[in-house]
UniProtKB/Swiss-Prot annotation:
Taxonomic placement: Bacteria, Bacillati, Bacillota, Bacilli, Bacillales
Name of the protein: Nucleotide-binding protein SAB0719
Binding-site residues for ATP, renumbered to this chain: G18, L19, S20, G21, A22, G23, K24, S25
Sequence similarity: Belongs to the RapZ-like family.
Cited function: Displays ATPase and GTPase activities.
Residue stretches in coiled coil: none
Length: 303
């Protein structure tokens, strides 16, 4: 195993810290969506024990992000020493990300959320004094950070995009597309981002031999696909999705749910969901899953 392969096999730990109100919670949420195992507000003294667990090779702990802030002020003072100890003694890749913002911006954010700064709770002081005290206390950990991000002029979306550029693992694609078929008469797919109604297509229900089957059966699938209307629809649908899906991912979504509905969710929607799932698997390097919610609900009513 060469040096590059050894580095790739190591577990990775990202310590996220910085000024209160600078965006740590948003960063942790983003990292979690990217496949990181996330821990919020771990006391620094427990960091070496936690890293020892990572060294044991648990797959779920291959990429870990830990948020540490100044709420435990006395414990926080040991963070720099603990990080140095971990780097020198334990075979884990460790980075420190420090988030900060201007005092004016932090004051504005606290006014918007109406939350108290953690250092205001430890004594009767103004918000601006609490922010200045925190900035001073965190200066040492800031000095050893691998990444310092000033979020003053970053929107939540822009901050997420920056985090993804820094830390997204190209070998671990977390964006997932779920394609599901459903029947309108059983209720719409509530978690869908996109819903397409295919009740305008010729219905296999009216072919006696096809009625008890589903779109998973070859005869039903071929029946649905043989119509010119189906081909035109599928071409327009895939053209639309080819345009939209990269935009959804760029926007920061970790999952896209595409629902295709017919009357009962047994024939047309099932066949088209299968075809769409196969198409998306071929075109995109994302995780694509196909699910048929109502395909096997037995009913004597029109499907």
């Amino acid at each position: 195993m060469d040096n590059n392969e050894k580095e790739k096999s190591k577990s990775e730990l990202l310590v996220v810290t910085g000024l209160s109100g600078a965006g740590k919670s948003l960063v942790i949420q983003c990292l979690e969506d990217m496949g990181y195992f996330c821990v919020d507000n771990l006391p620094p003294v427990l960091l070496p024990k936690f890293v020892e667990l990572m060294e044991q090779g648990n797959p779920s702990l291959r990429k870990v992000a830990i948020a540490i802030d100044l709420r435990g002020k006395e414990l926080f003072n040991s963070l720099v020493a603990v990080v140095d100890k971990v780097k020198s003694e334990i075979d884990v890749i460790i980075d420190v990300m420090f988030l900060e913002a201007s005092t004016e911006k932090l004051i504005s954010r606290y006014k918007e959320t109406r939350r108290a700064h953690p250092l205001m709770e430890q004594g009767k002081r103004s918000l601006i004094n609490a922010i200045n005290d925190e900035r001073e206390h965190l200066s040492q950990i800031r000095s050893i950070a691998n990444f310092v991000i000033d979020t003053t002029k970053l929107s939540p979306k822009e901050l997420k995009e920056r985090i993804r550029r820094y830390y997204e693992d190209e070998e671990f694609e977390t964006f997932t597309i779920n394609v599901t078929s459903f029947g309108f008469k059983h209720g719409i797919q509530m978690d869908a981002d996109l819903v397409f109604d295919v009740r305008f297509l010729p219905n296999p229900y009216y072919v006696v031999d096809l009625r008890p089957l589903t779109g998973l059966d070859k005869d039903v699938y071929n029946y649905v696909m043989k119509w010119k209307e189906t081909e035109i629809f599928f071409e327009k649908l895939t053209d639309l999705l080819d345009f939209m899906i990269p935009g959804y991912k760029k926007e920061g979504k970790s999952q896209l749910v595409i629902a295709i509905g017919c009357t009962g969710g047994q024939h047309r929607s099932v066949a088209l969901a299968e075809r769409l799932g196969n198409y998306l698997n071929e075109v995109f390097e994302y995780n694509v899953y196909v699910h048929h919610r109502d395909a096997h609900i037995e009913s004597g009513e029109k499907k």
